[in-house]
Amino acid sequence: MINNLKTFILLASLTALLVVIGGLLGGSTGMLVALLFAGIMNFSAYWYSDTLVLKMYNAEPLSNNHFVYHIVSELAHRAGTSVPKVYLINNSTPNAFATGRNPENASIAVTTGLLDRLTQEEITGVLAHELAHVIHRDTLINVVSATIAGAISGIANMFMWLSMFGHNSNNQEGVHPVVGMIMMIVAPLAAGLIQMAISRSREFEADAGGAQISGNPQWLASALLKLDQANHEQYFDEAETHPATAHLFIINPLNGEKLANLFSTHPSTAERVARLRAMY
């Protein structure tokens, strides 16, 4: 209950940040437009975000005969929940995510790199983690926050262009260049911090829930160590193009050398592994 209340407050904060940006752009009219825009985006995220995210990563559905589907099906039956659809992303960087508005309309996507690098037990640990996200309904919260955060980043960029080309010497029209630059920097960082607060505790809960579903915390712990190392060594092009979706993945897919990674939506892999090993 406390975690759900916290998430509601943080999602409301994301929406409020979007409204504030709208107010800075267009006064009271801008605030109303931003609020309407947020409502439309939340509605769209609820119904269509899973499809959009899967298209972003060119995910292809796996057949019911694929061994990954068999693992997901067995885990879902063990957990007493609906069997999600399973998708494959053709990318050598090992990672995975879950999406969908509820367990009945959920999807789990894995990369080809994950299947190539992990053992079947480790793959099972990862899939159980993603299934736990589905059961906890984190998938809806994640995609809604990603949608709003993406909108905030887009509007912040718009702010920058308006500040550069819409400001006149008499200070009568447009956005002041200094204000535009500040918003361009502060707004995405604020959105990222809110996403971080939403996502971190839910990752720990999904780790614990996934370990219970799979029956062996060590499988996920071993997988996380391999995934963390690989994602520091490789470049996930699609994730870099859509950074607002980074928190959907089991391991942060963004390049570790980037400044934005200081505000990671994921807790440290070392802490996650330590908690899993403590479950023995």
UniProtKB/Swiss-Prot annotation:
GO cellular component: plasma membrane
Family: Belongs to the peptidase M48B family.
Residues annotated to bind Zn(2+): 129, 133, 203
Active site: 130
Transmembrane listed as a keyword: yes
Protein's name according to its UniProt entry: Protease HtpX
Entry's transmembrane regions: 7-26, 30-49, 146-166, 178-198
Organism of derivation: Legionella pneumophila (strain Lens)
Cofactor: Zn(2+)
Origin superkingdom: Bacteria
Membrane topology recorded in Swiss-Prot or TrEMBL: Multi-pass membrane protein
